Amino acid sequence: MKRLLQLALILSVWACAASGQGQEAGDAVITRVEPLSWWTGMKTPLQLLVGGEGIGEYDRVSVEGGCGVKVKAVHKADSPNYLFVDVEVGKNAKPGTYTLVFGNGEAVVRYPYTIERRNRDYTRRESFTTKDLIYLIVPDRFANGDPSNDSTPDTVEKAQRESSMGRHGGDLQGIIDHLNYIADLGATALWSTPLLGDDAPRGSYHGYACSDYYHIDPRYGSNELYREMVEKAHEKGIKVILDVVTNHSSTSHWWMKDMPFKDWVHVKDPYVNTNHTFSLGMDPNAARSDIEIMEEGWFVRGMPDMNLDNPFMLKYFRQWAIWWIEYSGLDGFRVDTYFYNEKVPMSHWCKAVTDEYPGFNIVGECWNTNPDMIAYWQAGNPNHDGFDSHLPSIMDFPLQGAISAALSAPIPGQESPQPQGRGRRGADIGAVYNALSHDFIYHDLSHMLIFLSNHDIARIGDTFGHKPENMKIALTLLATLRGIPQLFYGDEMMFVTGNPRRDDGRLRMDFPGGWEGDSVNLFTPEGRAAASGEWAHAEELHDYARTLFQWRKGATALHGGKTLHFLPENNTYGYFRYDTKQVIFVFINNSDNAVNVPWTRFGEMSDKLGEGRNVLTGEKVTVDDNTPVPCKTAFVVEWDI
């Protein structure tokens, strides 16, 4: 009932604003106030972006409706159609609808604004951690729960499922309808690629060219439906991570027709593309001109680079991030193209979010396979220049490259590189050992997001040559290595495109069974059992992944334990994860021959252990030299201590 009343209140405010109610004939008409609403008890100061033709001339602003809420300052923009208004929501402020009064001589414009009661539960809920498995989906390609919104009159690009780069119709309702599948797999967190408005004329399905930071794209649903999805996910023990983009927006964003400030976005004449040189942000010898091109050049022509050095822009970005957390109750952020941002303002953005929500986790995409270059961007890292990003978590691209290399099939016609090279095709399992040997570089291993693939990398099933045995080894590594595991949708069943090279539209494929009329339904046990052809291994691999990740939820040694690993021999690799309650042993036989576990070699840990349990079969395991492990197989044992 409380939510219904809140919804009714907000809708009435929007209706009032849209109709111009409270605004006298001939006066300026306010068309936009953001944030859409605010709350009592927030640490973050409130600064309103007010938009409307001629509103910049209304520099006398006050608040009607009660004590505790007042205007502190009014700032004019370069454009006469904007004002930025600092509003103090005092400790004694009460929830309700207040009236903003804008004056220009005798002309007066009024606008209703809602202050709600803060939900204190949001500050106490745990964000995503090493206890979780994050399931990554592309919402347009996951499931279509509401065909009526596949195309909408207020968006440019219409549904075109037959095109790999078109919109296919997946939406929030489709996610809600399949939360049981995600939970049953063992996933406890859901990361969706961006859901906010993207009105690009082509390729808008990916969502990385945001055209509205305060509204869900209508082809996915609505803000209210997103909040409902978060609530239903929480009911099933699933946390929700919102994918956001701070580096760039879209040429289709409403403000590109009339920017508040001339430097709201970086504009170069002639046009300048970013140089994509990731090392510049930490290079003590870098030329300032090169750094400027990296930070201020556009990612692509359709994605304007945001100027976070503009203090009004930075406040605007801080507030929409905090607004979405408080409004929806989401549990974490993933930040796209993290180190393309101006690094100091971006560190302030991260700190503002975590100051408002202590313990809130944010993971940044710092795409580089050199450990020292990604370690720089993690909060608390002792950097040479004293810089602290305040970014809690980073994505472990070096480890992803190592796993891919260790288990990959050579590309036809391409010569295999040297073995054991980190991130190279044709390497053996030693590539994983080598990647983990760099762990001394990282400030906090518990805040490393580990993964096999994602929406920007070739399908791992293609990389592995469509070999289910390699997929099982990879899933085992993902479940048992240090860090926070993330699984790309469909990798639990080895989705493949048939192309070992990256093809964005094809690798972000539709989940079979997510659309009415699909001939295959991999969401159900019956559908997986009946699948054939390219899906022939779906049931076998899904059951394997489910066993691992359901077990992982209670494996404390994987949540906060230490790692002890041994030098690989003959393409085999053994390591222990352990804490005060549990010991887990993983033996990877990546060779073409069956071997026995050389327990004596692992005596440093195994000599202390008695009878254990095979995690994958449930069978008892004794520590002796007669434990056979077939070729291309992972062996996992646990002991309670």
Language-model-detected regions and their locations in the chain:
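Bacterial N-terminal signal peptides
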Residues: Q6-A15
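Substrate-binding/active-site clefts of carbohydrate-active enzymes
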Residues: F142-Y327, M346-E356, N361, C366, ...
